[in-house]
Regions:
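Residue-level recognition of the N-termini of beta-strands and the immediately preceding loop/turn
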Residues: 11, 60-63, 97-100
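Residues that form generic nucleotide/phosphate-binding pockets
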Residues: 2, 49, 111, 115, ...
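RecA-like P-loop NTPase motor core
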Residues: 1-52, 57
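Short, flexible coil/linker elements and helix-boundary hinge sites characteristic
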Residues: 5-8, 52-57, 94, 124, ...
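Glycine-rich, often proline-containing surface loops adjacent to acidic residues and nearby aromatics
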Residues: 57-69
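Activity-critical C-terminal alpha-helical subdomain
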Residues: 67-168
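Hydrophobic, Leu/Ile/Phe/Ala-enriched alpha-helical segments that form helix-helix packing faces
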Residues: 2-4, 46-54, 84-92, 205-217
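Extended, basic/helix-rich recognition subdomains
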Residues: 143-218
Length: 218
């Protein structure tokens, strides 16, 4: 089943076409990343509805927080760094809430581009609007054309970025790698070179086994 709670919409959208999987997509009350902790009650209330009304197994589910690193929408690097280190596991974070922060540089459109472009991780954009403009100029890059083959290409771009930046990583314990990515990307942006195109969304697919990584690539 698929359950969706959009920002500023009172109702939930539910689809039961796939009875073998359960996915819930929830917007924070505001689009800014600080809403993760500043509006905790809102998310807690949504989780309660999912548990009680839709029998969604929140406590046994992988939780991911997807946000853009676009410096115009998320302006507090120190807070982002804090979330990278504390939201480090989709299931359990000791004394902190469950969930893994997945950043895209500069925005989630990076994942879409990486589905359709080889060496996409060498493209550079400063803002999410730049990535959207690139997509608008390349009409073959379309979300409805994403397939198993294109997702594998995106996964390869994910891995190639890590290799090219010499970032050691463990798929199940990715916090240190995520922090290294953030540090390198911030330095690139502050030097005026923009962000290298990169999305951590692939990490979720690897952690959940939707995409499997060959041993020789690790």
């Amino acid at each position: 089943s698929y359950i969706e709670k959009r920002r500023n919409r009172p109702t939930y959208f539910v689809s039961i076409q796939d009875r073998f999987s359960q996915i819930a997509v929830v917007n924070t009350r505001e689009s800014n990343i600080r809403d993760i902790s500043e509006n905790e009650k809102y998310l807690d209330d949504v989780f309660d509805v999912l548990r009680e009304q839709y029998k969604f197994p929140i406590d046994q589910s992988a939780i991911y927080y997807l946000f853009d690193r676009d410096p115009k929408s998320n302006t507090d690097p120190a807070l982002i760094e804090k979330y990278i280190l504390s939201l480090a596991n989709p299931y359990d974070n000791n004394d902190y809430k469950a969930g893994q922060l997945l950043l895209s540089y500069p925005s989630i459109e990076s994942y879409l581009v990486s589905n359709f472009r080889d060496a996409a991780n060498f493209l550079r954009f400063s803002l999410g609007t730049d990535a959207k403009k690139y997509i608008g100029q390349n009409t073959d890059i379309q979300i409805n054309k994403i397939s198993e083959e294109t997702m594998i290409n995106a996964a390869d771009e994910f891995l190639q970025y890590l290799v090219s930046e010499r970032i050691a990583f463990n798929i199940d314990e990715f916090s240190e790698a995520g922090h290294a990515i953030f540090t390198k990307q911030e330095a690139e942006y502050l030097a005026g070179r923009g962000f290298r195109l990169f999305s951590m969304l692939t990490l979720a697919f690897l952690q959940m086994g939707i995409i499997e990584m060959e041993e020789k690539l690790q």
